Amino acid sequence: MILPAPHVEYFLLAPMLIVFSVAVAGVLAEAFLPRRWRYGAQVTLALGGSAVALIAVIVVARSIHGSGHAAVLGAIAVDRATLFLQGTVLLVTIMAVVFMAERSARVSPQRQNTLAVARLPGLDSFTPQLSAVPGSDAERQAERAGATQTELFPLAMLSVGGMMVFPASNDLLTMFVALEVLSLPLYLMCGLARNRRLLSQEAAMKYFLLGAFSSAFFLYGVALLYGATGTLTLPGIRDALAARTDDSMALAGVALLAVGLLFKVGAVPFHSWIPDVYQGAPTPITGFMAAATKVAAFGALLRVVYVALPPLHDQWRPVLWAIAILTMTVGTVTAVNQTNVKRMLAYSSVAHVGFILTGVIADNPAGLSATLFYLVAYSFSTMGAFAIVGLVRGADGSAGSEDADLSHWAGLGQRSPIVGVMLSMFLLAFAGIPLTSGFVSKFAVFRAAASAGAVPLVIVGVISSGVAAYFYVRVIVSMFFTEESGDTPHVAAPGVLSKAAIAVCTVVTVVLGIAPQPVLDLADQAAQLLR
C-alpha cells in the first residue's frame, strides 16, 4: 500500500512559510557570511521578509471567501481573524526589528572603516557576546572590538513564525508546537541585555522555568481533552462535548489548557513573571514581547473559546469573569506603587489583559471584533512607549545605561519636549483618555461586554481605568511639571528609521482615537472564525 502524500495549501500558508524561510536564511547567514556582512544581511532579511509576508497576508485575505479555509489536513485555519492577527503581528515585527537594529554598538576608532558594526549613535541594548561571563575579560574585549549580536534577528523571526501559527492552529497539537516555537527564542532573547547582565539572565531563567511549567500544564490539558473527546481538532472537540453528558474530564483538561494560555497573555494569577522579565530583558525585546506575544496568545485563546468550548459556555464564563476582575484589579493596584517605569508598564500590561478579557467574555461577534481592535491599538501604543523608554539613558549618556527610575525623570519633558509629548500620548492612550486609541478600544470591549450582560465586569473595568490614570499622569507630571535634578537622564538620538517608527506609533495612536471607523470596520469583517 502506497502512503499518499498530504495535500499542502502553499498559497494559504505563504505568509507563515515566508517568515520561517527568512528565519532559516538568517541562520545560514550566521553560519556562512563573514562577520562584517552579517549585520546588514540580517536586518535586510528581517525587514524585507516581514514586509513580503505582510503583502502575502493581504493577498491571501483578498482571496478568502466565506468563513475561510482549513489547510494541512485541517491543522491550520486560514480565516479572516487569522489573517488580521497575522497582519498585526507582522506590523509589530517590522517596528520591533527597526528598534532592535537601532541598538547597535558604537563604532570604535580602530574600526571606523569596516562594516563589522552599524554606525549608530551608541544605542546598544544587547550584549556583544552572549557566551562571555558578565564582567569578564572576554566581554570587555568584545566591547572594545565593537562586536554586535546579530543572532537575535533569526531568533526573532523564528518567534514570529510561531506567533503566526499560534492563532491559526485548528488543533491542539499544532497549537502546542506553535507555542513552543514562539516561546523558546524569546527565552534566549530576554537574556541578551548589555547592561545589568545578571538581571537579564535572571529574567530569562525565570521566564524559561515558568514557561516550561505552563507548557506542561497545557500539554497535560491536551491529553485530558483527547481522552475525553477522542480528537485534537477544535471543531471535533466542540462536537464531542456537545454530545457528552459527563464533562468532568473535559473540564479538567480545559482548566489545564487555560493555564498555558493565560500564562502567555499574563493574566492573574499567572502574571508573576511579567514585571521581572519586562524589567530585565532588553527594552526592544520587552516591547516586542508585550505587543506581539499578546496578539498571538489572545488569538489562540479566542479560537479555543469561540470554536471548541461553546458547549461549556456556562462553565468557563464565570471562571473568566473572576480572572478578568482579578487581573484588572491586581495590575492596576500594583502599578500604583512602582517607581521603575518598565515595571510600571509591566503591571499596566497586566491590567490591559483584564480589559481585553472583558471582550473575550462577551462571547459574541461584537466582543470578537472589539478584542481584535484592542489588540491593534494596544500594540502600537506599547511599541512606541517602550521604544521611547529605551532612548532614556543615564545622566552620563553612556550606551546601554538605560535609566527607567521614575525619580530621575523629573524635567525630562522640558529637556526633550518632543519625546515627552510622544510618551505622554502613549500613556494617555493606556489610560483610555478620549481622542486616543485607548478610549475607543476600551469603549468597544466594555460595550460588547455590557451587551452580553457583563455589566458588573464593565463597572470594575471603568473603576480600574480611573485608578490607572493616576500612575500614567504621575509620569507626565514628573516629566513636565517637576524641576529637573542633577541626575536627570539624557534622551539618546535615534536613527531615521527609529524616528519614523516612533512617529508611526504616535500617529496611529491619535488617528485610531479620532477616526477609528476604518479599522473598526476591518476588525468587524475579520470577526469570523472557521468553525
From Swiss-Prot:
GO terms for cellular component: plasma membrane. InterPro entries: NADH-Q_OxRdtase_suN/2 (IPR010096), ND/Mrp_TM (IPR001750). PANTHER family: NADH DEHYDROGENASE (PTHR22773). Belongs to the complex I subunit 2 family. HAMAP family: NDH1_NuoN_1. NCBIfam families: NDH_I_N, PRK05777.1-4. This is NADH-quinone oxidoreductase subunit N. It comes from Mycobacterium tuberculosis (strain CDC 1551 / Oshkosh). The lineage of its organism: Bacteria, Bacillati, Actinomycetota, Actinomycetes, Mycobacteriales.
